[in-house]
Amino acid sequence: MGLEDKPDLVAGLITTRDASERPADEGEGLLAHVAEVTVIIENRGDAIAGETTTRFWITGGDIDQELRVIQTPPLLPGAEVEVTALWNMRGLDGQYDIIVTADAFSQLEEMRKDNNAAVAHVVVRGTRVELV
């Protein structure tokens, strides 16, 4: 298998959405202190990327822990998928880094591995989370 016929998963832009930003119909069942953390995973390679694992990690304050691990579906070359984790921010005022890693457990042989992670710096104030 040559370099040109491998998948290449990329963790792209990380976004957050707290209760104040959720339309009422989408927030049904979600508590006010729960935020959504979403990343776009894209296959920039030239081969199909099989099912993999995307890991969300939170660090800052007294926290350095896995938030969630999500099975990510197979992706054709050029395809992308949004992957979302829920974050319980109750009592977590302060600054945090959210690190999201595509193919977190190196399940695929990829063109590159240095583009699998993305980081977002956020500030939590009560039930609000803001990118900084």
Give the positions of each predicted feature:
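Extracellular/luminal regions of secreted and cell-surface proteins that mediate adhesion/ECM remodeling
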Residues: M1-V132
